[in-house]
Regions:
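N-terminal export and membrane-targeting signals
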Residues: 1-9, 15
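A conserved glycine-rich beta-strand in the N-terminal activation segment of trypsin-fold
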Residues: 2, 46-53, 67-87, 119-121, ...
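N-terminal activation segment of mature serine protease catalytic domains
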Residues: 15-78, 84, 249-253
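Active-site loop architecture of trypsin-fold serine endopeptidases
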Residues: 28, 70-77, 94-108, 144, ...
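Residue-level signature of the cytosolic catalytic core of signaling kinases
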Residues: 44, 48, 151-153, 189
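Conserved hydrophobic/aromatic pocket- or pore-lining residues that grip, position, or stack substrates
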Residues: 64, 158, 179
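Short, glycine-anchored, charge-dense loop/turn motifs used at functional sites
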Residues: 64, 85-87, 216-218
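Conserved active-site neighborhood of the chymotrypsin/trypsin-like protease fold
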Residues: 69-75, 83-172
Length: 256
């Protein structure tokens, strides 16, 4: 638990407004040349770890930005592509205000911005408020690059990790760090999230729902929250992600 006197827990998908509401336009897709792609394929086939740049190249096409608009609020977060036809994993709190199931604002609109800059409408197909997870379906999309889910991948303190997402509306952002701790519990919005991965990779408002990945480019967690100093400043190197083991049931149930 985080002591309230020391740090305030901030859910990673901020309400739009002020600087959080200033989303940069344009695509930030990272493409790799043929020689780089071949090197990555060889490394993955051999079970080797990748460089930070290689991991970013592999994972970035599978990360989306989510803008959810309800009657009372608009929130922004990130998501992980689960299938080529547009199934997307994110945090429930990113879309809860825009859905009738558990949302205050009533259903209005959810828009997904893909890694190539294209936009698509989306609907919620599954929610798990207890574990802060949701699965979306993007409309009219095909040929998307699904992320590699690290089912069974070991998560050890000290492992190198990268966090992906759209902090403060900055699409295509990648931050690096390590696994700082495992099995953390935090109090979030009146509920308790358990078995979380703690990382010092920067996680800020807008990162929620984005992937935390290991050095093999496998998704090992879903970014969910960060701790801030009492003055409300940005990342202080204490971020949290829901482990894939918690989400695997929802993933398997929605990707066939």
């Amino acid at each position: 638990m985080i002591a309230a006197a020391a740090a305030a827990l901030v859910i990673g998908a901020g309400t739009l407004g002020g600087v959080v509401g200033t989303q940069l336009a344009g695509s930030r897709t990272s493409t790799a040349g043929s020689s780089t792609s071949t090197a990555i394929a060889v490394a993955l086939a051999a079970g080797q770890t990748l460089s930070t740049a290689q991991v970013a190249s592999v994972v970035s096409p599978s990360v989306v930005t989510i803008t959810a608009t309800g009657n009372r609020q608009t929130s922004e977060g990130s998501g992980i592509v689960l299938s080529s036809n547009g199934r997307i994993l994110t945090n429930n709190h990113v879309v809860a205000g825009s859905t009738s199931r558990g949302g205050r604002g009533g259903p209005i609109a959810i828009e997904v911005t893909l890694a190539n800059g294209k936009k698509a409408n989306a609907t919620v197909v599954s929610q798990d408020a207890t574990h802060d997870l949701a699965v979306l379906q993007a409309s009219g999309v095909s040929g998307l690059t699904a992320a590699t889910i690290g089912t069974g991948a070991a998560v050890n303190v000290g492992d190198s990790v990268l966090a992906f997402g759209s902090p403060l509306g900055l699409e295509g952002t990648v931050t690096a760090g390590i696994v700082s701790a495992v099995n953390r519990s935090i109090d979030s919005g009146g509920s308790t999230l358990t078995n979380l991965i703690q990382t010092d990779a920067a996680i800020n408002a807008g990162n929620s729902g984005g992937p935390l990945v290991n050095a093999a480019g496998q998704v090992i967690g879903i970014n969910v929250a960060n701790a801030t100093a009492s003055n409300g400043s940005g990342s202080i190197g204490v971020g949290f992600a829901i482990p894939v083991s918690t989400a695997i049931g929802m993933i398997n149930g929605n990707v066939g």
